[in-house]
């Protein structure tokens, strides 16, 4: 199971966030990514790879100032991905990446 941690606000530093986030690394030991949100906040994702381990498939995914993290597996995502690929350029082969263009 992956680890997801988020914080909205400006009263803690990136270093403090990372210190606490590192305590959950056993839940997502394969890769880690932390993103600072311009409006004030931090979101982190530690990955437990199920469908491959590429840097392009690393979350949070970003599209038009929207961030997405997903701790799940989307079954039957390929037909949806094919339909969306007519208007959206996918950066990875991750099943979860379909959620951002679906949201928009």
Could you describe each region identified by the protein language model?
Residues 1-104:
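N-terminus-centric sequence/structural signature that marks the extreme N-terminus
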């Amino acid at each position: 199971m992956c680890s997801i941690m988020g914080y909205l606000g400006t009263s803690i530093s990136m270093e403090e966030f990372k210190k606490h986030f590192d305590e959950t690394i056993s839940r997502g030991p394969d890769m880690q990514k932390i993103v600072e949100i311009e409006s004030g906040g931090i979101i982190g994702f530690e990955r437990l790879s199920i469908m491959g381990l590429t840097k392009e498939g690393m979350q949070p995914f970003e599209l038009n100032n929207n961030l997405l993290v997903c701790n799940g597996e989307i079954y039957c995502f390929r037909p949806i991905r094919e339909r969306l690929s007519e208007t959206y350029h996918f950066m990875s082969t991750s099943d979860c990446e379909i959620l951002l263009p679906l949201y928009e």
